[in-house]
Every structure is written in C-alpha cells, then in structure tokens.
Amino acid sequence: MQRGKKYRAHKEKVDSTKFFSIDKAVELAKSTSYTKFDGTLEIATKVNYKSLQNIRGTISLPHGTGKKIRVLVFCKGDKQNDAKAAGADFVGDTDLIEKVAGGWTDFDACVATPDMMKDVGKLGPILGRKGLMPKPKAGTVTTDVAKAVNELKAGRIEYRPDKGGVVHLGVGKVSFDNTKLIENIRTVVQTLMRDKPSDAKGEYLKTFSISPTMGVGVKVDVKELVNTSI
C-alpha cells in the first residue's frame, strides 16, 4: 500500500529494525503522530496460544483512554436510579430495547441486569456485531450496575485477539504525558500475563508494538517490557 508524504517523512524517525524500551517507544510513537486532532496511542501484541476464543477479559486502565464513553444500561426499578446516579448516559428497559431493535446504537458500552438478559439477548444480531452485547465474564451483566458504569467510565476496556492472535487496544491519547501512557501500557501487560491460560507454553506475548492513530508503528522489546511490568 502506497503511503502518503507525511507518513514517509515521519517514518524516517524510527529505525524499523530495532526494538525499543517502552519509554523510548512511547516517545517515538508520539513524535510520529500527524493528525490535526488528538489521536489515540494504540498497542498491538501477538499472543502465543492456539485456542484464541479462550483469550478474553477486561482491563482497567489507571488513567483511562481519554475517550468519553457513552454507557447504556438495561435495568428496571431502583436499578435505574442507581445507573443514572453513577453517570449512565442511557437507562431504560423495554423502551430502550425497542429503540436498539430499530437499529439505534449511539453508545460505546452496554450493561444489563440478569433479569433483562432474556429480552436483551434478542438484540444479539445488532449488539453482537458491534461488540456491545453484555457478558457476565466482562462484568457487564450484573446486579451492581453502578459499579459497572463507574468502571466503564473510568476506562475499563474489554480485550480479545483477532483471528491472527493479535490484541489491539487504545491506551490513551497522544496528548497524555508519557508517564500515564506507560503506566496504562504496563497495566495491559500485567493483566494479559495474569490472565494467561495455565497451559500456555513458551513466550506468551510474542511481539509488541505501539502506534498513534495516524503515524508510525514502533516495535517494543517485549521481553524487557514483560520482565519490568510483572
């Protein structure tokens, strides 16, 4: 794929044959961002495990992602007051289910109480396609809706690898100071290693790179990153 002049100019800042420490990688990646808006710094790490469907979970970033998360909560009665008090953007039961069934999905995360899942489950073709279906394992099917909303607003993100075994995650805005970005990245590594399947063999994280929304990818010394993060 032919890259533009801006990309090629910034690519000269990064030696693609080298693997950098996390501190240097963050510094370099930020320096190659050429968006007019405040771009996101993203990580990509390849996991070494065959049963990819078993690798998934949530990560609570200490400094959030910098993105305003719009949270929808399906619940009834007093739970609606709890969700609203916690800062949920959209709260309801059958009325919201009907709205989503009509194709409306202007939200970034979805929470539901267990008693709502029979009806919410019918929204699978809509919510599932966008990765918005509430799941017990992700903490989004729960009776404690306030806790779920607070965590999502604070920067809890869900992770799962793509078909190639690569986990892609946004870990903050380019405008974040380096220390906050590095702490977010180390939290990602700590969580992935903590959740590593017990039968995983060899090096679990095979590769690790950082890149801005529009900019150059920087390869990280994954062994050093893991050893200094856990």
From Swiss-Prot:
GO biological process: regulation of translation; translation
Lineage top rank: taxon: Bacteria
Gene Ontology terms: cellular component: large ribosomal subunit
Keyword tRNA-binding: yes
Cited InterPro entries: Ribosom_uL1_bac-type, Ribosomal_uL1, Ribosomal_uL1-like, Ribosomal_uL1/biogenesis, Ribosomal_uL1_3-a/b-sand, Ribosomal_uL1_CS
Keyword entries, A-Z: Repressor, Ribonucleoprotein, Ribosomal protein, RNA-binding, rRNA-binding, Translation regulation, tRNA-binding
SUPFAM superfamilies (alphabetical): Ribosomal protein L1
One example GO MF annotation: structural constituent of ribosome
Quaternary assembly: Part of the 50S ribosomal subunit.
Protein family (similarity comment): Belongs to the universal ribosomal protein uL1 family.
NCBIfam families in alphabetical order: rplA_bact
Function: Binds directly to 23S rRNA. The L1 stalk is quite mobile in the ribosome, and is involved in E site tRNA release.
HAMAP family noted in UniProt: Ribosomal_uL1_B
Name of the protein: Large ribosomal subunit protein uL1
Source species: Leptospira interrogans serogroup Icterohaemorrhagiae serovar Lai (strain 56601)
Gene for this chain: rplA
